[in-house]
Amino acid sequence: MSENIAVVGSGAFGTALAAVIALAGRSAVTLVGRNPSLISDLKAERLHEVALPGIYLPDTLEFAAEPEAIAGASIVLFAMPSQAQADAARQYGPYLAKDAIVVTCAKGIERATGNLLTDMLERELPDHSVAVLSGPGFAADIAKGLPTAMAIAAEDMQIAERLAQAISGRTFRLYASSDRIGVQLGGALKNVLAIACGIVEGGGIGDSARAALIARGLAEMSRFVVAKGGQADTVRGLSGLGDLVLTATSHQSRNLRFGIALGRGEKVDPLQGALVEGALAASVASRLAAGLAVSMPITDAVSAIIDGRLDIAEAIEQLMTRPITTE
């Protein structure tokens, strides 16, 4: 089935998604951005030198700077940062086709409310089906055509399968899921754990500590996902374990690099420059976990370090002297 797909958000990830879907050749694809000058340059040069230097975009990819460009799309992907998605829904919502499916591609939690992004989008766009795309995929890898697999989840499995068919290509494979909660929380929480792994690397705390953080962090993710109504199996899949391993070990990860800077004692503002989603998610997740009586000591420690309530030595001391328990 051929689809008309619009990708809203002309940053690295949105551009990479639009490019790989266009290359699959099954759907008409338009990349929609809010910067007319950038869109004009992309049309002329087929190159996004700021976000994806040296990677040329396919000739079949269309570009637009007007919100009404999404009007004919059957699938609309929101590829801007998590905290910008509510504003995007309000801006683009009036132009959505009646039966358009909206897919959030951000990995975060709404900071003001603690809501999942699908919940927020359903609040803003109550007449539309909302899905989520998440998993281990860096924009540059996707745009270069390197093999990448991610998850796409909708409450209706038939919609998830339709989206997986429409978006997948030779180098980009999506697995369908009906667990929107698990897929979203995996994407949000792994960013927090990647910061923790960066702190370990930057502080020279050792590879053994990193391995412990990944394993125990996965346990935290699983407890939280189940408490929120998601499935533990999802945490062990692409959007949980897969994304955690990638983000906690690759220096392409903004969250890992932010953690490394913290571990070195550098003063870094996570809201300056490229947004560090995990820094925003840490305090929200810590607060929500407390309300659910879910133990998340690593997430709590990362939140406290970012907020300046604990230094790294104190955080390690607290983690290592917790009461002995079973795994």
Swiss-Prot record:
It is found in: Cytoplasm. Pathway: Membrane lipid metabolism; glycerophospholipid metabolism. One of its GO terms (cellular component) is cytosol. Belongs to the NAD-dependent glycerol-3-phosphate dehydrogenase family. GO terms for molecular function: glycerol-3-phosphate dehydrogenase [NAD(P)+] activity; NAD binding. This is Glycerol-3-phosphate dehydrogenase [NAD(P)+]. Catalyzes the reduction of the glycolytic intermediate dihydroxyacetone phosphate (DHAP) to sn-glycerol 3-phosphate (G3P), the key precursor for phospholipid synthesis. Its EC number is 1.1.1.94. The keyword Coiled coil does not apply. One of its GO terms (biological process) is carbohydrate metabolic process. Pfam families: NAD_Gly3P_dh_C, NAD_Gly3P_dh_N. Disulfide bonds: none annotated. Keywords: Cytoplasm, Lipid biosynthesis, Lipid metabolism, NAD, NADP, Nucleotide-binding, Oxidoreductase, Phospholipid biosynthesis, Phospholipid metabolism. NADPH binds at F13, R34, K107, A139, R254, V276, E277. It catalyses: sn-glycerol 3-phosphate + NAD(+) = dihydroxyacetone phosphate + NADH + H(+); sn-glycerol 3-phosphate + NADP(+) = dihydroxyacetone phosphate + NADPH + H(+). InterPro entries: 6-PGluconate_DH-like_C_sf (IPR008927), 6PGD_dom2 (IPR013328), G3P_DH_NAD-dep (IPR006168), G3P_DH_NAD-dep_C (IPR006109), G3P_DH_NAD-dep_N (IPR011128), NAD(P)-bd_dom_sf (IPR036291). It comes from Rhizobium leguminosarum bv. trifolii (strain WSM2304). SUPFAM superfamilies: 6-phosphogluconate dehydrogenase C-terminal domain-like, NAD(P)-binding Rossmann-fold domains.
